[in-house]
């Protein structure tokens, strides 16, 4: 909606009925980037927003949201090794130059969604967020 005196941006909550998905963290990852010498690392935490049929994430109470997250985590547990493999494969193929620009991060986001979506057949990925993204 605007900026506060402290410089923080305030945004309005999504309109009622708009599905922002149910957020599910894929955990923290530390990987070597594909730079020559292999001395550059990426530490990231990725959060997916998943559309759950019949559920509008933005309308859930905190308790209902936690229940949905627990249910999703349990349903994703059998494919967690494949999810982790995709994350590792995609992230370790990137160089520092490819992931340091806003355009590079957006391309990485799109590639991860394209790579993960076939595995998550019954859930549409509505967003992928880098809760943490540190290059060293």
Residue ranges and their predicted role:
Residues 1-136:
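Flexible, low-complexity charged segments
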């Amino acid at each position: 909606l605007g900026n506060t005196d402290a410089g923080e941006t305030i945004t309005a909550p999504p309109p009622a009925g708009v599905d922002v998905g149910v957020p599910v963290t894929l955990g923290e990852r530390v990987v070597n980037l594909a730079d020559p010498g292999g001395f550059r690392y990426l530490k990231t935490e990725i959060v997916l927003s998943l559309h759950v049929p019949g559920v509008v994430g933005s309308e859930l109470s905190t308790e209902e949201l936690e229940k949905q997250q627990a249910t999703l985590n349990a349903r994703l547990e059998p494919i967690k090794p494949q999810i982790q493999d995709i994350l590792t494969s995609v992230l370790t193929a990137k160089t520092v130059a490819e992931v340091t620009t806003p355009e590079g991060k957006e391309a990485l986001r799109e590639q991860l969604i394209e790579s993960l979506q076939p595995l998550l057949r019954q859930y549409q990925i509505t967003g992928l967020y880098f809760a943490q993204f540190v290059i060293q």
